[in-house]
Amino acid sequence: MPAWARYALVLAATAVFVVFAYHARYAKIDEFTGFRMEEMTRLIAGVLAALYALTVAVELHIGRKLNVGAQALLCVVVGLILLAKVSLFDYVSDDYDIFLSNWIYEYSQMGIKQGLGTYIGSDYTPPYLYLLLLISRVKNYPWQYLVKAVSMAFEVLLAYAVTQLAGLQVRGAGKRVVIFNLTLMLPTVVFNGAYWGQCDVIYTSLA
């Protein structure tokens, strides 16, 4: 499939996914009344659509030698994987409830410059704290969704890295996309990011 056709497929598949994401139901959404419900839903759908587009684009790049039907099927598979993970978004882990949410709230009370220079009692490395600082700029929003979305974005990088490493021994686009999808579905990956909202995948993907 030529590159322009892959891009068109990514756009078309993302448009379909946005419809599903927009009409999904999120248990925590009623707790945030700063935005109108429609605005909140659009924001959530936008975040999920960006995740979907990233994942599909990377997977179609890996499977670029597959036929059109196979690539269209990959778009469906990615959508199902992502929707399954989204179903875990409303779970609030103790770590998020006790630590992450409070750190983000503290940052939300500061400006960017002040936040960069303030120690908030965290033992996380500065780059991750900078991500939390950026998340805190989004007011009246379910921050846990963004925390989990960040981890899920790095899951794509992890899956790509694993696929590239496996590609040293495994030949064939079909096998490589299977490895990519299996990595995204590993229990440790799913629970660490979409369920617990942990950031272990970030440094793992960059290792």
What does each model-identified segment do?
Residues 82, 125, 148, 152, ...:
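Hydrophobic transmembrane-helix microenvironments that flank and shape a buried ionizable site
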Residues 66-73, 139-146, 175, 192-195:
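Membrane-interfacial loop-to-transmembrane-helix junctions in polytopic alpha-helical membrane proteins
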Residues 149-170:
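Transmembrane-helix motifs of polytopic, lipid-linked glycan transferases
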Residues 79, 83, 134, 153-157, ...:
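Generic alpha-helical transmembrane segments of integral inner-membrane proteins
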Residues 176-206:
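Membrane-embedded helix bundles of polyisoprenyl
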Residues 116-148:
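Interfacial juxtamembrane loops and adjacent helix segments
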Residues 89-105, 112, 119-131:
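Extracytoplasmic catalytic/substrate-binding loops of multi-pass membrane glycan-assembly enzymes
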Residues 1-86, 164-171, 176-178:
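Start-transfer (signal-anchor) and selected internal transmembrane alpha helices
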